[in-house]
Each structure stands twice: as structure tokens, then as C-alpha cells.
A protein has these predicted regions:
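Catalytic helix-loop patch of NAD(P)-dependent Rossmann-fold dehydrogenases
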Residues: 2-43, 48-49, 54
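Glycine-rich, phosphate-binding/catalytic loops in enzymes
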Residues: 7-11, 59-61, 94, 131
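Hydrophobic alpha-helix immediately C-terminal to the catalytic Tyr-X-X-X-Lys motif of short-chain
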Residues: 26, 30, 34, 65, ...
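Oxidoreductase cofactor-interface core, primarily capturing Rossmann-like NAD(P)-dependent enzymes
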Residues: 38-44, 51-76, 86-87, 91
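C-terminal substrate-binding subdomain of Rossmann-fold SDR/epimerase-dehydratase oxidoreductases
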Residues: 72-73, 77-205
Length: 205
């Protein structure tokens, strides 16, 4: 939900706004309630993932901005002051690989945030512009979407000694390369890149 404090940590109160976040929180509570010597639940709360992947999504903030910048030569920013923490897809994978090998007794029942860059949407647009083409136009549009939050991954870094290796700029350039080499085509009209459309097509929603 919307948070005013400078860094949101794992023990802060939760106030989910969307059904998606409400269901995720409910799942956390259910999993943690089953903790025992034979079941070691561990919760990762990732920031928004960005970058190129084989099951590509183009409905996430950095990927949306990069898609528009590369193909339309314009970036539409709705609002702009909202903070959006992100994590590169390669670091997200590394987090999961890391904890598969971690000590279960240490992990059991724990919760960690996973995200390294807390930028405003305006800042994200500027990062994309810098890496795609400085001539790209950024259009700012008013919005009533005031979701804004700034997460801290200090626990992941300090308690578990995890280090992030990839940046938002890396994600933008990975996508740029995928567009350049034809790995991603029809990026505005192919429903497979957009989760809501994909789920609608198979009657999940």
C-alpha cells in the first residue's frame, strides 16, 4: 500500500490495496502458520521485476517504459513522483538460488524484502531515456494512482550477506538488445506479454 516512511522493512504493518497484494499476504500467513520441524516456510517479498526473460512480461514499469521508448520514441509518465522499487530478473533468480542452499534453521519463518533500487517513476523514465536515446520525449500525465513505497533490503544484505549484481540500466539494455535482435516481436499487441490479457484469454479472470 501507500507508505510515508523512508524505508519499509519486513516487520512494518501491511496495508494491501489490491486484491493481488491481499491474496499474497494471506498466503504468507497461511504458510507461516504451518511452520514446524518438518516444514520451514520462508517468505521473499520481491520488488517489481525488470529486464529480459524467456517468458517476457511487458506490463511491468521499467519494461513498459523501455518498450515505449524503443518503439514509439516517447515515454508517457503517469504522475511521476511515486516510488517504485525494482529488482533485475537475474538478481531475482539469484535470490531464489541463494536461499535454496541456505541453512533451513536460520531461514525458517523469516521474511525478507528483495529489491535494490527505489526510484520514482520520473527517475525511471530518465534512466530509460539515457540508455535508449536521449532524444526521446517524456510526456507527463496526471494520475490518481498514488501507490508509492520505498523498501529496504538491508536485512537480506546484512543478515544473509546477499549482494545484488544488476541495475535498472542493465535491465533496460538487456531489453534493448532483445528488441534489436528480434527476440521480442509485436510487443504491443501480443497478449503473451501482458498477464491480465493472457489470463483473460484462458478464462482465468
Amino acid at each position: 500500500g501507500v507508505k510515508e516512511k523512508s524505508n519499509v522493512i519486513e516487520t512494518d504493518s501491511t496495508h494491501p490495496i489490491t486484491d493481488y497484494s491481499k491474496f499474497k499476504l494471506n498466503c504468507e500467513k497461511i504458510l507461516l502458520s504451518y511452520k514446524n520441524k518438518n516444514f520451514c516456510p520462508f517468505i521473499v517479498r520481491p520488488a517489481t521485476v525488470c529486464g529480459y526473460s524467456r517468458r517476457q512480461r511487458l506490463d511491468l514499469i521499467v519494461n513498459i517504459l523501455t518498450n515505449f521508448a524503443f518503439h514509439k520514441k516517447v515515454i508517457n509518465v503517469f504522475g511521476g513522483d511515486q516510488l517504485r522499487p525494482n529488482i533485475h530478473i537475474k538478481d531475482m533468480i539469484r535470490v531464489y538460488e541463494f536461499f535454496i542452499k541456505e541453512d533451513l534453521d536460520k531461514m525458517s519463518g523469516d521474511i525478507v524484502n528483495a529489491g535494490i533500487e527505489n526510484n520514482s517513476v520520473n527517475e525511471l523514465a530518465e534512466i530509460v531515456k539515457k540508455n535508449i536515446d536521449n532524444k526521446i520525449e517524456i510526456k507527463r500525465v496526471p494520475t490518481d494512482d498514488n501507490r508509492s513505497y520505498h523498501i529496504s533490503s538491508k536485512k537480506l544484505i546484512k543478515d544473509y550477506n546477499f549482494q545484488f549484481n544488476h541495475t535498472i540500466s542493465d535491465a533496460v539494455n538487456d531489453l534493448k538488445n532483445a528488441f534489436d535482435t528480434g527476440k521480442l516481436k509485436n510487443t504491443f499487441n501480443d497478449d503473451k506479454f501482458f498477464n491480465v490479457k493472457l489470463m483473460q484469454n484462458i478464462n482465468l479472470i
